[in-house]
């Protein structure tokens, strides 16, 4: 990391082509290193997202879930990704992350949807499909339950149109 800093400082000081890209990659490297350091410092009893990433079976399941948010996941399928039995996976997931796998999936989908509502003018029905909902009305109810307001209202509020 130290040599990367020196290289980036030289590139910046001499205004070499591509310096912005170098700085962006260095920022990513520092972020990953900071996360790794935090994970390494966790106690065996630690809970939360970082603790789950330290647990290889849970990390496999989270990687699959995060990578395919629109997939119609079941606890059984996530347990298969984790290479654990359904009951062992569900208990370990809830103990480590503080909620059952399907509650986590819903929360993750709503956070993804919220980001898309902020950043994209796409219709709500399309955003619903992108995060795994076939029905806009089912998505809207789930979004309101998780985020405290329906998706259309959320978009208005975050875009300053309310």
Question: Which residues does each PLM region occupy?
Answer:
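Terminal helix-turn-helix DNA-binding modules in bacterial transcription factors
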Residues: 60-67, 71-79, 84-85, 91-137, ...
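Short, Lys/Arg-enriched, Trp-marked, Pro/Gly-tolerant hinge/linker segments that flank
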Residues: 12-27, 31-71, 76-81, 95-100, ...
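Aromatic/histidine-rich interaction motifs
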Residues: 1-6
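DNA-recognition helix of C2H2 zinc fingers
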Residues: 140
């Amino acid at each position: 990391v130290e040599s990367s800093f020196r290289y980036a400082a030289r590139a910046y000081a001499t205004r070499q082509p591509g310096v912005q890209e170098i700085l962006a990659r260095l920022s990513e490297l520092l972020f990953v290193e900071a996360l790794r350091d935090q994970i390494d410092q966790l106690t065996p009893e630690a809970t939360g997202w970082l603790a789950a990433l330290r647990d290889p079976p849970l990390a496999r399941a989270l990687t699959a879930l995060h990578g395919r948010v629109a997939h119609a996941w079941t606890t059984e399928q996530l347990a298969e990704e984790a290479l654990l039995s359904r009951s062992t996976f569900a208990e370990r997931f809830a103990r480590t992350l503080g909620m059952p796998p399907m509650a986590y999936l819903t929360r993750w989908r709503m956070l993804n949807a919220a980001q898309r509502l902020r950043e994209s003018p796409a219709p709500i029905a399309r955003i619903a499909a992108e995060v795994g909902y076939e029905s806009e009305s089912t998505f809207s109810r789930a979004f309101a339950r998780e985020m405290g307001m329906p998706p259309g209202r959320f978009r208005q509020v975050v875009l300053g149109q309310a």
